């Protein structure tokens, strides 16, 4: 048991220091590792070093039987493969049981995005007379204006925001940084929040910090906190609207491409290493498809 804890602790330090992964990613990795460790104990296997390839097959079979998606299972495999690769590198174990495990073939899913009308509903519900409402409005505007990941948003500091140049410095995956511009709506919302709302919320903080977005107690706003805020805004805006934080990123990319932005520029803004990751956003909305069809097909309208 002591070995198990030490292995996980060393791996977490590696992810933090060498890989510079976000806390959100690290938590997901640890969850997968702990789930596998629990599985091994149930099987009567005393440690990670005793796991064999056939054990990984049983573990993944159970995951499929639970109804987990291929995407979720792929994430678990990637986390455990990285964990064992690290243990091998450190010479803590002799074999990697996940080395021969293949990732399941992914279903091609079109990312869900918001239509302009749905967005406008969200932008109208924050109570900007209150500090929390100022924060919520700034958060919503910035996420849509930049398309940054929620984990990236949580790490933005006040010094990363340039209200004169209308840009924000984003700290992405693998220690990569990029500047993203934002428009006048985001600028005004940020200005109000930074000059007033944030100061009020910080008065409750136990210790000072320079992170841009803060919670009701003045502490750093987490990814879970952002999900909670967006859920609250959705409930106020519409009972039929379903949204998760990443959907604003999908919407950002979709709207840019629908309005004629080139794929390479969108790739840079999103912080994707590979163009293939951005190409999933080349789908177009049903409205745009219909408008294109009605405007260009010779027999779209019956002539009188």
Curated annotation (Swiss-Prot):
Task: Give the UniProt entry's GO cellular component terms.
Answer: cytoplasm
Q: Which residues form the Core-binding (CB) domain?
A: 2-88
| Primary localization | cytoplasm
Q: Where is the Tyr recombinase domain?
A: 109-294
Query: What is an example of a Pfam family matching this protein?
Result: Phage_int_SAM_1
Keyword annotations for this protein, in alphabetical order, are: Cell cycle, Cell division, Chromosome partition, Cytoplasm, DNA integration, DNA recombination, DNA-binding
Q: Where is the active site?
A: 149, 173, 246, 249, 272, 281
Enumerate the subcellular locations listed in this protein's record, separating them with semicolons: Cytoplasm
Highest taxon in the source lineage = Bacteria
What GO MF annotations does this protein's record show?
DNA binding; site-specific recombinase activity; tyrosine-based site-specific recombinase activity
Q: Name one GO biological process term.
A: DNA transposition
According to its UniProt entry, what is the function of this protein? Site-specific tyrosine recombinase, which acts by catalyzing the cutting and rejoining of the recombining DNA molecules. The XerC-XerD complex is essential to convert dimers of the bacterial chromosome into monomers to permit their segregation at cell division. It also contributes to the segregational stability of plasmids.
Task: State how it assembles.
Answer: Forms a cyclic heterotetrameric complex composed of two molecules of XerC and two molecules of XerD.
The entry assigns this protein to a family as follows: Belongs to the 'phage' integrase family. XerC subfamily.
Q: What is this protein called?
A: Tyrosine recombinase XerC
Q: Which lineage is the organism of this entry classified under, starting from the top rank?
A: Bacteria, Bacillati, Bacillota, Bacilli, Bacillales
């Amino acid at each position: 048991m002591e070995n198990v804890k030490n292995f996980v602790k060393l791996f977490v330090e590696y992810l933090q220091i060498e890989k510079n992964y976000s806390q959100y990613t690290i938590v997901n990795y640890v969850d997968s590792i702990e789930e596998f460790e629990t599985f091994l104990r149930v099987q009567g296997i005393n440690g990670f070093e005793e796991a064999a390839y056939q054990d990984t097959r049983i573990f993944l079979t159970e995951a499929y039987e639970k109804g987990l998606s291929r995407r979720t299972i792929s994430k678990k495999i990637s986390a455990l493969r990285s964990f064992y690769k690290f243990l091998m590198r450190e010479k803590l174990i002799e074999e990697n049981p996940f080395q021969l495990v293949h990732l399941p073939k992914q279903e091609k899913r079109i990312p869900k995005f918001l239509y302009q009308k749905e967005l406008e509903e969200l932008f109208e519900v924050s109570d900007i007379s209150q500090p929390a409402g100022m924060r919520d409005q700034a958060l919503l505007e910035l996420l849509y204006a930049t398309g940054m990941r929620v984990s990236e948003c949580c790490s933005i500091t006040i010094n990363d925001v340039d209200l004169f140049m209308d840009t924000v410095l984003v700290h992405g995956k693998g220690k990569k940084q990029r500047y993203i511009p934002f428009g006048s709506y985001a600028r005004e919302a940020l200005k109000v929040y930074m000059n007033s709302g944030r100061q009020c919320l910080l008065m409750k903080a136990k210790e000072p910090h320079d992170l841009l977005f803060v919670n009701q107690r003045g502490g750093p706003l987490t990814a879970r906190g952002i999900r909670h805020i967006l859920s609250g805004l959705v409930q106020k805006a519409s009972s039929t609207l379903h949204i998760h934080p990443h959907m604003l990123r999908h919407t950002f990319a979709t709207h840019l491409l629908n309005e004629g932005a080139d794929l390479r520029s969108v790739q840079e803004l999103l912080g994707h290493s590979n163009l293939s990751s951005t190409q999933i956003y080349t789908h177009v909305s049903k409205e745009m498809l219909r408008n294109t069809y009605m405007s260009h097909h010779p027999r779209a309208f019956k002539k009188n």
